[in-house]
């Protein structure tokens, strides 16, 4: 434990674990899914926002490619992720 400015800051290892998780395929798919859901709800209100629609399509493509990669490399992790996020299988 380190002290900085009167506050206790817990470990160096916590930051490392967070950084490791950010790079994983599962975290990236999770992040893209959250962005996709947010953009989809935005587009329901703003039907003529074509730049956001294009951004949504790009995110869908990125997520699809990551899911295809994960399905090819590790089918068990792919199935688990699909069920957790409630998204359809390709």
Curated annotation (Swiss-Prot):
GO BP of this protein: translation
Keyword Ligase: no
Domain of life: Eukaryota
Main location: plastid
Coiled-coil stretches: none
Matches recorded under InterPro entries: Ribosomal_uS15 (IPR000589), Ribosomal_uS15_bac-type (IPR005290), uS15_NS1_RNA-bd_sf (IPR009068)
PROSITE patterns cross-referenced by the UniProt entry: RIBOSOMAL_S15
Family of this protein: Belongs to the universal ribosomal protein uS15 family.
Name the UniProt record assigns to this protein: Small ribosomal subunit protein uS15c
Localisation per UniProt entry: Plastid, Chloroplast
Gene: rps15-A
Molecular functions (GO terms): structural constituent of ribosome
Source taxonomy: Eukaryota, Viridiplantae, Streptophyta, Embryophyta, Tracheophyta
GO CC annotation terms, alphabetical: chloroplast; ribonucleoprotein complex; ribosome
Gene3D superfamilies documented for this protein: S15/NS1, RNA-binding (1.10.287.10)
Any Pfam family the entry gives: Ribosomal_S15
Quaternary context: Part of the 30S ribosomal subunit.
Keywords: Chloroplast, Plastid, Ribonucleoprotein, Ribosomal protein
């Amino acid at each position: 434990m380190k002290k900085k400015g009167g506050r206790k800051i817990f470990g160096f290892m916590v930051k490392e674990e967070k950084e490791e998780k950010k790079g994983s395929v599962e975290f990236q798919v999770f992040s893209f899914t959250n962005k996709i859901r947010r953009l989809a709800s935005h587009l329901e209100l703003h039907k003529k926002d074509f730049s956001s629609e294009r951004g949504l399509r790009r995110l869908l493509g990125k997520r699809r490619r990551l899911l295809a990669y994960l399905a090819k490399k590790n089918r068990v992790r792919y199935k688990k992720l699909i069920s957790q996020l409630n998204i359809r299988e390709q």
